[in-house]
UniProtKB/Swiss-Prot annotation:
Swiss-Prot/TrEMBL catalytic activity: ATP + H2O = ADP + phosphate + H(+)
Domain of life: Eukaryota
Family: Belongs to the actin family.
EC identifiers of the protein: 3.6.4.-
N-acetylmethionine: residues bearing it: 1
Name of the top EC class for this enzyme: hydrolase
Name of the protein in question: Actin, cytoplasmic 2
PROSITE patterns: ACTINS_1, ACTINS_2, ACTINS_ACT_LIKE
Record-listed Tele-methylhistidine modification sites: 73
Swiss-Prot/TrEMBL keywords: Acetylation, ATP-binding, Cytoplasm, Cytoskeleton, Hydrolase, Methylation, Nucleotide-binding, Nucleus, Oxidation
Quaternary structure, from the entry: Polymerization of globular actin (G-actin) leads to a structural filament (F-actin) in the form of a two-stranded helix. Each actin can bind to 4 others.
Protein backbone atom coordinates (compact mmCIF):
# COMPACT_ATOMS: atom_id res chain seq x y z
CA UNK A 1 0.00 0.00 0.00
CA UNK A 2 1.43 3.41 -0.95
CA UNK A 3 2.05 5.79 1.92
CA UNK A 4 0.48 8.76 0.17
CA UNK A 5 -2.81 6.92 -0.13
CA UNK A 6 -4.17 7.18 3.38
CA UNK A 7 -6.60 4.53 4.53
CA UNK A 8 -10.08 5.67 5.47
CA UNK A 9 -11.36 4.79 8.93
CA UNK A 10 -15.14 4.66 9.32
CA UNK A 11 -16.72 3.87 12.68
CA UNK A 12 -20.42 3.40 12.07
CA UNK A 13 -22.17 3.75 15.39
CA UNK A 14 -25.89 3.41 16.08
CA UNK A 15 -26.09 7.12 16.82
CA UNK A 16 -23.15 8.85 15.16
CA UNK A 17 -20.88 7.98 12.27
CA UNK A 18 -17.22 8.90 12.80
CA UNK A 19 -15.01 9.03 9.70
CA UNK A 20 -11.57 10.24 8.73
CA UNK A 21 -8.08 9.33 7.62
CA UNK A 22 -5.74 6.81 9.23
CA UNK A 23 -2.90 8.57 11.03
CA UNK A 24 -5.06 11.52 12.11
CA UNK A 25 -5.66 11.96 15.83
CA UNK A 26 -9.39 12.67 15.50
CA UNK A 27 -12.14 11.95 12.98
CA UNK A 28 -12.69 14.67 10.33
CA UNK A 29 -16.40 13.99 10.06
CA UNK A 30 -18.82 13.18 12.85
CA UNK A 31 -22.47 13.18 11.89
CA UNK A 32 -25.70 11.48 12.99
CA UNK A 33 -26.32 8.01 11.50
CA UNK A 34 -29.69 9.17 10.26
CA UNK A 35 -31.51 8.92 6.96
CA UNK A 36 -34.53 11.22 6.65
CA UNK A 37 -37.34 11.06 4.11
CA UNK A 38 -39.96 13.78 3.49
CA UNK A 39 -43.15 13.27 5.49
CA UNK A 40 -45.25 15.12 2.94
CA UNK A 41 -44.69 14.87 -0.77
CA UNK A 42 -44.34 18.02 -2.81
CA UNK A 43 -44.96 20.75 -0.25
CA UNK A 44 -41.37 21.93 -0.03
CA UNK A 45 -41.18 24.60 -2.70
CA UNK A 46 -37.75 25.41 -4.06
CA UNK A 47 -36.02 22.76 -2.02
CA UNK A 48 -35.28 20.64 -5.04
CA UNK A 49 -37.12 17.42 -4.29
CA UNK A 50 -34.59 15.01 -2.82
CA UNK A 51 -36.02 11.69 -1.77
CA UNK A 52 -33.65 11.36 1.17
CA UNK A 53 -31.31 13.34 3.39
CA UNK A 54 -28.41 12.02 5.45
CA UNK A 55 -26.73 13.14 8.66
CA UNK A 56 -26.70 16.81 9.64
CA UNK A 57 -28.89 17.84 6.71
CA UNK A 58 -31.54 15.34 7.82
CA UNK A 59 -31.10 16.64 11.36
CA UNK A 60 -31.62 20.29 10.38
CA UNK A 61 -34.70 19.51 8.27
CA UNK A 62 -36.06 17.09 10.88
CA UNK A 63 -39.30 19.04 11.27
CA UNK A 64 -40.49 17.92 7.83
CA UNK A 65 -38.80 14.52 7.68
CA UNK A 66 -39.28 11.08 9.14
CA UNK A 67 -35.92 10.09 10.64
CA UNK A 68 -34.67 6.51 10.63
CA UNK A 69 -31.52 5.01 12.12
CA UNK A 70 -30.24 2.14 9.92
CA UNK A 71 -28.09 0.79 12.78
CA UNK A 72 -29.94 -0.62 15.75
CA UNK A 73 -28.18 -1.97 18.82
CA UNK A 74 -24.88 -1.66 16.98
CA UNK A 75 -25.98 -3.91 14.13
CA UNK A 76 -26.98 -2.77 10.65
CA UNK A 77 -30.66 -3.54 10.02
CA UNK A 78 -31.32 -1.52 6.87
CA UNK A 79 -28.70 -1.99 4.16
CA UNK A 80 -30.18 0.44 1.62
CA UNK A 81 -30.01 3.26 4.14
CA UNK A 82 -26.59 2.09 5.31
CA UNK A 83 -25.34 2.39 1.75
CA UNK A 84 -26.66 5.97 1.66
CA UNK A 85 -24.72 6.74 4.84
CA UNK A 86 -21.48 5.31 3.42
CA UNK A 87 -22.02 7.16 0.15
CA UNK A 88 -22.53 10.38 2.10
CA UNK A 89 -19.40 9.65 4.18
CA UNK A 90 -17.12 9.18 1.17
CA UNK A 91 -18.48 11.74 -1.27
CA UNK A 92 -19.89 14.55 0.89
CA UNK A 93 -18.04 14.39 4.20
CA UNK A 94 -14.54 13.16 3.34
CA UNK A 95 -14.75 14.07 -0.37
CA UNK A 96 -12.70 11.10 -1.49
CA UNK A 97 -13.06 8.45 -4.17
CA UNK A 98 -13.51 5.17 -2.27
CA UNK A 99 -11.96 3.22 -5.16
CA UNK A 100 -8.63 4.88 -4.33
CA UNK A 101 -8.39 4.16 -0.59
CA UNK A 102 -8.36 1.09 1.63
CA UNK A 103 -11.26 1.28 4.09
CA UNK A 104 -11.25 0.12 7.72
CA UNK A 105 -14.77 -0.43 9.06
CA UNK A 106 -15.77 -1.24 12.62
CA UNK A 107 -18.37 -3.70 13.88
CA UNK A 108 -20.09 -4.56 17.12
CA UNK A 109 -18.72 -7.55 19.04
CA UNK A 110 -20.75 -10.71 18.37
CA UNK A 111 -21.96 -9.17 15.09
CA UNK A 112 -23.80 -11.82 13.00
CA UNK A 113 -21.55 -13.40 10.36
CA UNK A 114 -23.90 -12.47 7.53
CA UNK A 115 -23.53 -8.82 8.52
CA UNK A 116 -19.79 -8.59 8.10
CA UNK A 117 -20.10 -10.44 4.78
CA UNK A 118 -22.64 -7.92 3.58
CA UNK A 119 -20.38 -5.02 4.65
CA UNK A 120 -17.52 -6.59 2.74
CA UNK A 121 -19.65 -7.13 -0.33
CA UNK A 122 -20.94 -3.55 -0.41
CA UNK A 123 -17.44 -2.10 -0.01
CA UNK A 124 -16.00 -4.12 -2.90
CA UNK A 125 -19.00 -4.25 -5.22
CA UNK A 126 -20.75 -0.93 -4.70
CA UNK A 127 -17.81 1.29 -3.80
CA UNK A 128 -15.01 -0.66 -5.52
CA UNK A 129 -12.54 -0.17 -2.67
CA UNK A 130 -9.05 -1.58 -3.37
CA UNK A 131 -8.88 -3.15 0.11
CA UNK A 132 -10.87 -3.28 3.33
CA UNK A 133 -10.86 -4.65 6.86
CA UNK A 134 -13.46 -5.05 9.61
CA UNK A 135 -12.31 -4.55 13.22
CA UNK A 136 -14.17 -5.07 16.50
CA UNK A 137 -14.96 -1.73 18.13
CA UNK A 138 -13.93 -2.54 21.70
CA UNK A 139 -10.54 -3.90 20.63
CA UNK A 140 -9.84 -0.60 18.87
CA UNK A 141 -10.74 1.33 22.04
CA UNK A 142 -8.24 -0.70 24.01
CA UNK A 143 -5.51 0.01 21.41
CA UNK A 144 -6.32 3.70 21.68
CA UNK A 145 -5.68 3.57 25.43
CA UNK A 146 -2.23 2.10 24.75
CA UNK A 147 -3.03 -1.36 26.12
CA UNK A 148 -3.30 -4.86 24.70
CA UNK A 149 -4.86 -6.44 27.81
CA UNK A 150 -7.90 -5.16 29.67
CA UNK A 151 -11.67 -5.17 29.70
CA UNK A 152 -13.52 -2.56 27.68
CA UNK A 153 -16.96 -1.37 28.71
CA UNK A 154 -18.09 0.21 25.46
CA UNK A 155 -21.42 1.98 25.56
CA UNK A 156 -22.71 3.99 22.65
CA UNK A 157 -26.14 5.01 21.45
CA UNK A 158 -27.50 1.59 20.58
CA UNK A 159 -25.72 -1.08 22.56
CA UNK A 160 -23.32 -1.70 25.45
CA UNK A 161 -20.68 -4.43 25.46
CA UNK A 162 -18.16 -5.65 27.96
CA UNK A 163 -15.25 -7.16 26.10
CA UNK A 164 -12.30 -8.80 27.87
CA UNK A 165 -9.16 -8.68 25.75
CA UNK A 166 -5.94 -10.53 26.46
CA UNK A 167 -2.73 -9.76 24.55
CA UNK A 168 -4.78 -8.17 21.76
CA UNK A 169 -7.33 -10.98 21.37
CA UNK A 170 -10.96 -10.53 22.36
CA UNK A 171 -12.19 -13.51 24.39
CA UNK A 172 -15.53 -14.28 22.68
CA UNK A 173 -16.88 -16.62 25.36
CA UNK A 174 -16.69 -13.82 27.92
CA UNK A 175 -18.13 -10.96 25.86
CA UNK A 176 -21.45 -9.78 27.21
CA UNK A 177 -23.95 -7.59 25.40
CA UNK A 178 -26.47 -5.33 27.03
CA UNK A 179 -29.20 -3.80 24.87
CA UNK A 180 -29.25 -0.70 27.00
CA UNK A 181 -27.46 2.41 25.84
CA UNK A 182 -27.79 6.08 24.96
CA UNK A 183 -30.96 5.80 22.91
CA UNK A 184 -32.76 4.00 25.73
CA UNK A 185 -31.63 6.69 28.16
CA UNK A 186 -32.94 9.38 25.81
CA UNK A 187 -36.30 7.57 25.64
CA UNK A 188 -36.33 7.21 29.41
CA UNK A 189 -35.60 10.92 29.86
CA UNK A 190 -38.50 11.69 27.47
CA UNK A 191 -40.70 9.56 29.70
CA UNK A 192 -39.68 11.11 33.01
CA UNK A 193 -39.88 14.64 31.59
CA UNK A 194 -43.46 13.83 30.55
CA UNK A 195 -44.17 13.03 34.22
CA UNK A 196 -43.02 16.56 35.00
CA UNK A 197 -45.55 17.88 32.49
CA UNK A 198 -43.31 18.53 29.50
CA UNK A 199 -44.35 16.72 26.34
CA UNK A 200 -41.78 15.32 23.92
CA UNK A 201 -43.10 12.78 21.43
CA UNK A 202 -41.90 13.12 17.83
CA UNK A 203 -38.59 11.90 16.40
CA UNK A 204 -37.56 15.55 16.08
CA UNK A 205 -38.30 16.24 19.76
CA UNK A 206 -36.35 13.17 20.75
CA UNK A 207 -33.25 14.92 19.39
CA UNK A 208 -33.93 17.87 21.71
CA UNK A 209 -34.15 15.50 24.67
CA UNK A 210 -30.89 13.87 23.59
CA UNK A 211 -29.27 17.31 23.78
CA UNK A 212 -30.71 17.91 27.27
CA UNK A 213 -29.32 14.53 28.32
CA UNK A 214 -25.84 15.25 26.95
CA UNK A 215 -25.66 18.71 28.51
CA UNK A 216 -27.25 18.21 31.93
CA UNK A 217 -27.22 14.57 33.06
CA UNK A 218 -24.68 13.04 35.44
CA UNK A 219 -24.19 9.84 37.43
CA UNK A 220 -24.72 10.01 41.19
CA UNK A 221 -22.14 8.32 43.42
CA UNK A 222 -24.89 7.37 45.86
CA UNK A 223 -28.32 7.37 44.21
CA UNK A 224 -30.50 7.31 47.36
CA UNK A 225 -28.51 10.12 48.96
CA UNK A 226 -28.71 12.21 45.79
CA UNK A 227 -32.49 11.69 45.63
CA UNK A 228 -32.66 13.02 49.21
CA UNK A 229 -30.63 16.08 48.28
CA UNK A 230 -32.81 16.74 45.24
CA UNK A 231 -35.99 16.46 47.32
CA UNK A 232 -34.84 18.79 50.09
CA UNK A 233 -33.20 21.57 48.07
CA UNK A 234 -33.13 23.09 44.61
CA UNK A 235 -29.32 23.01 44.40
CA UNK A 236 -29.38 20.30 41.72
CA UNK A 237 -31.89 22.05 39.46
CA UNK A 238 -30.79 23.30 36.07
CA UNK A 239 -32.68 25.06 33.32
CA UNK A 240 -32.61 24.43 29.59
CA UNK A 241 -33.89 26.65 26.80
CA UNK A 242 -35.89 24.88 24.11
CA UNK A 243 -35.56 25.96 20.44
CA UNK A 244 -38.79 27.99 20.75
CA UNK A 245 -37.47 30.00 23.69
CA UNK A 246 -39.46 28.16 26.36
CA UNK A 247 -37.30 27.37 29.41
CA UNK A 248 -37.72 24.08 31.25
CA UNK A 249 -36.27 23.12 34.62
CA UNK A 250 -34.97 19.67 35.46
CA UNK A 251 -33.90 18.36 38.85
CA UNK A 252 -33.56 14.72 39.90
CA UNK A 253 -34.12 13.69 36.25
CA UNK A 254 -30.50 14.74 35.71
CA UNK A 255 -29.19 11.68 37.54
CA UNK A 256 -32.30 9.45 37.44
CA UNK A 257 -31.83 9.10 33.69
CA UNK A 258 -28.27 7.62 33.62
CA UNK A 259 -28.95 5.68 36.84
CA UNK A 260 -30.75 3.23 34.54
CA UNK A 261 -27.28 2.09 33.40
CA UNK A 262 -26.75 0.72 36.91
CA UNK A 263 -30.40 -0.20 37.54
CA UNK A 264 -31.98 -1.38 34.26
CA UNK A 265 -35.16 -2.16 36.22
CA UNK A 266 -35.90 1.58 35.83
CA UNK A 267 -36.54 0.79 32.15
CA UNK A 268 -38.48 -2.36 32.94
CA UNK A 269 -35.49 -4.51 31.95
CA UNK A 270 -34.44 -7.58 33.88
CA UNK A 271 -30.76 -7.42 32.96
CA UNK A 272 -27.82 -6.54 35.21
CA UNK A 273 -26.41 -3.03 35.31
CA UNK A 274 -23.18 -2.08 33.55
CA UNK A 275 -21.13 -2.63 36.73
CA UNK A 276 -22.45 -6.16 37.23
CA UNK A 277 -22.14 -6.97 33.53
CA UNK A 278 -18.48 -5.90 33.64
CA UNK A 279 -17.94 -8.06 36.73
CA UNK A 280 -19.71 -11.06 35.14
CA UNK A 281 -17.60 -10.68 32.02
CA UNK A 282 -14.41 -10.76 34.11
CA UNK A 283 -15.68 -13.83 36.00
CA UNK A 284 -16.16 -15.69 32.70
CA UNK A 285 -12.41 -15.36 32.08
CA UNK A 286 -9.62 -17.60 33.27
CA UNK A 287 -8.83 -16.99 36.93
CA UNK A 288 -5.20 -16.12 36.10
CA UNK A 289 -6.02 -13.10 33.96
CA UNK A 290 -8.75 -11.52 36.10
CA UNK A 291 -6.28 -9.42 38.04
CA UNK A 292 -5.10 -7.79 34.80
CA UNK A 293 -8.68 -7.10 33.76
CA UNK A 294 -9.68 -5.49 37.07
CA UNK A 295 -6.63 -3.25 36.88
CA UNK A 296 -7.35 -2.24 33.27
CA UNK A 297 -11.05 -1.52 33.00
CA UNK A 298 -11.41 0.92 30.12
CA UNK A 299 -14.54 2.98 29.48
CA UNK A 300 -15.37 3.82 25.89
CA UNK A 301 -18.20 5.34 23.86
CA UNK A 302 -20.46 8.38 24.20
CA UNK A 303 -22.65 6.90 26.93
CA UNK A 304 -19.62 6.75 29.25
CA UNK A 305 -19.24 10.54 29.02
CA UNK A 306 -21.48 11.33 32.02
CA UNK A 307 -19.66 13.15 34.81
CA UNK A 308 -19.29 10.81 37.80
CA UNK A 309 -19.51 7.54 35.87
CA UNK A 310 -15.90 6.44 36.50
CA UNK A 311 -16.11 7.02 40.26
CA UNK A 312 -19.40 5.14 40.43
CA UNK A 313 -17.97 2.20 38.42
CA UNK A 314 -14.95 2.13 40.75
CA UNK A 315 -17.25 2.02 43.78
CA UNK A 316 -19.60 -0.64 42.37
CA UNK A 317 -16.91 -2.98 41.05
CA UNK A 318 -14.90 -2.65 44.26
CA UNK A 319 -17.93 -3.89 46.20
CA UNK A 320 -18.37 -6.89 43.85
CA UNK A 321 -14.71 -7.91 43.54
CA UNK A 322 -12.53 -9.69 46.13
CA UNK A 323 -11.54 -7.18 48.81
CA UNK A 324 -7.78 -7.33 48.11
CA UNK A 325 -8.15 -6.74 44.38
CA UNK A 326 -6.66 -3.59 42.85
CA UNK A 327 -9.29 -2.00 40.64
CA UNK A 328 -8.58 0.74 38.16
CA UNK A 329 -11.16 2.37 35.92
CA UNK A 330 -9.60 4.15 32.96
CA UNK A 331 -11.76 6.90 31.47
CA UNK A 332 -9.70 8.64 28.75
CA UNK A 333 -10.95 12.17 27.98
CA UNK A 334 -11.23 11.30 24.27
CA UNK A 335 -13.25 8.12 24.93
CA UNK A 336 -16.17 9.36 22.87
CA UNK A 337 -13.99 8.72 19.81
CA UNK A 338 -11.61 6.06 21.11
CA UNK A 339 -12.94 3.39 18.72
CA UNK A 340 -12.15 5.68 15.79
CA UNK A 341 -8.76 6.66 17.22
CA UNK A 342 -7.86 2.98 17.70
CA UNK A 343 -8.80 2.36 14.07
CA UNK A 344 -6.63 5.25 12.96
CA UNK A 345 -3.70 3.79 14.92
CA UNK A 346 -4.26 0.25 13.63
CA UNK A 347 -4.64 1.18 9.95
CA UNK A 348 -1.43 3.21 10.00
CA UNK A 349 0.78 0.48 11.53
CA UNK A 350 3.29 -0.94 9.06
CA UNK A 351 2.67 -4.43 10.46
CA UNK A 352 -1.04 -4.11 9.67
CA UNK A 353 -0.57 -3.59 5.94
CA UNK A 354 -0.55 -7.33 5.18
CA UNK A 355 -3.86 -7.75 7.03
CA UNK A 356 -6.04 -5.88 4.53
CA UNK A 357 -8.44 -7.94 2.40
CA UNK A 358 -7.56 -6.97 -1.17
CA UNK A 359 -10.01 -6.70 -4.06
CA UNK A 360 -8.19 -9.63 -5.65
CA UNK A 361 -8.68 -11.87 -2.60
CA UNK A 362 -12.33 -10.88 -2.52
CA UNK A 363 -12.79 -11.71 -6.21
CA UNK A 364 -11.22 -15.13 -5.63
CA UNK A 365 -13.02 -16.09 -2.42
CA UNK A 366 -16.17 -13.97 -2.14
CA UNK A 367 -17.55 -12.29 1.00
CA UNK A 368 -16.65 -15.20 3.32
CA UNK A 369 -12.99 -14.13 3.11
CA UNK A 370 -13.81 -11.66 5.90
CA UNK A 371 -14.06 -14.46 8.49
CA UNK A 372 -10.62 -15.77 7.63
CA UNK A 373 -8.85 -12.42 7.63
CA UNK A 374 -10.66 -10.32 10.22
CA UNK A 375 -11.07 -11.40 13.77
Amino acid sequence: MDDEIAALVVDNGSGMCKAGFAGDDAPRAVFPSIVGRPRHQGVMVGMGQKDSYVGDEAQSKRGILTLKYPIEHGIVTNWDDMEKIWHHTFYNELRVAPEEHPVLLTEAPLNPKANREKMTQIMFETFNTPAMYVAIQAVLSLYASGRTTGIVMDSGDGVTHTVPIYEGYALPHAILRLDLAGRDLTDYLMKILTERGYSFTTTAEREIVRDIKEKLCYVALDFEQEMGTAASSSSLEKSYELPDGQVITIGNERFRCPEALFQPSFLGMESCGIHETTFNSIMKCDVDIRKDLYANTVLSGGTTMYPGIADRMQKEITSLAPSTMKIKIIAPPERKYSVWIGGSILASLSTFQQMWISKQEYDESGPSIVHRKCF
